[in-house]
UniProtKB/Swiss-Prot annotation:
Source taxonomy: Bacteria, Pseudomonadati, Pseudomonadota, Gammaproteobacteria, Enterobacterales
A Pfam family it matches: Bac_DnaA
Subunit structure, interactors included: The active form seems to be an ADP-bound monomer. Forms the RIDA complex (regulatory inactivation of DnaA) of ATP-DnaA, ADP-Hda and the DNA-loaded beta sliding clamp (dnaN).
GO biological process, one term: negative regulation of DNA-templated DNA replication initiation
HAMAP family to which the protein is assigned, alphabetical: Hda
Record protein name field: DnaA regulatory inactivator Hda
Function: Mediates the interaction of DNA replication initiator protein DnaA with DNA polymerase subunit beta sliding clamp (dnaN). Stimulates hydrolysis of ATP-DnaA to ADP-DnaA, rendering DnaA inactive for reinitiation, a process called regulatory inhibition of DnaA or RIDA.
Disulfide bonds: none
């Protein structure tokens, strides 16, 4: 399965907020040469996909083979796509809640997990919108397997952390996002980070096109606020 991931979702562009332990655990698993498993759960939009993309990017840059399976897009492929993935250096399964109750997918994930345990060399990262025991899986053995490893809740960012995350993403894109503009966006817009980053992209494009710096009046004009 071809791997197409956002090139701006790396560990360098992820603002940690109250998640230093999770980031340390991820880095530790990625550094080690043997298998390791981490389950990350959070509400939608907290950044769990970003972390999987970042993990894939880091190992890909080392020349390692990785696999990323977004189960919210499972209609694009079949459960058999997991066959042979135990030979990769890293497997990331995103949004496992999307296949709760889907027997073929649950069995495919369970079998992959067991093959990874046997291989002893593949790192496995899985995300969901709730802890493993609350996923309402139809296969009890899979729920048990998912509960075995390190389990972390990805804590949402505070408003101050969101401000820092916006400014960090802007700097990585090569421009400055003034603090007053950030606070204006947080006050007037949906504060879910994915939405805020999309707005940031829109403002970056508008700023380049108009050859203007980002100010509150300019932002109001572009976003029609």
């Amino acid at each position: 399965m071809p791997l197409y991931l956002p090139d701006d979702e790396t560990f360098a562009s992820f603002w940690p907020g109250d998640n230093p332990s999770l980031l340390a655990a991820l880095q530790n698993v990625l550094r080690q040469e043997h298998s390791g498993y981490i389950y990350i759960w959070s509400r939608e939009g907290a950044g769990r996909s970003h972390l999987l993309h970042a993990a894939c990017a880091e190992l890909s840059q080392r020349g390692d083979a990785v696999g990323y399976v977004p189960l919210d897009k499972r209609t694009w492929f079949v459960p058999e796509v997991l066959e042979g993935m135990e030979q990769l250096a890293l497997v990331c399964i995103d949004n496992i809640e999307c296949v709760a109750g889907d027997e073929p997918w649950e069995m495919a994930i369970f079998n992959l997990y067991n093959r990874i345990l046997e291989s002893g060399k593949t790192r496995l990262l899985i995300t969901g919108d709730r802890p493993p025991r609350q996923l309402n899986l139809g296969l009890p053995d899979l729920a048990s397997r998912l509960d075995w490893g390190q389990i972390y809740k990805l804590q949402p960012l505070s408003d101050e952390d969101k401000l820092q995350a916006l400014q960090l993403r802007a700097r990585l894109r090569g421009f400055e996002m003034p603090e007053d503009v950030c606070r204006f966006l947080l006050k007037r817009l949906d504060r879910e980070m994915r939405s805020l980053f999309m707005t940031l992209d829109q403002l970056d494009h508008a700023s380049i096109t108009a050859q203007r710096k980002l100010t509150i009046p300019f932002v109001k004009e572009i976003l029609k606020l």
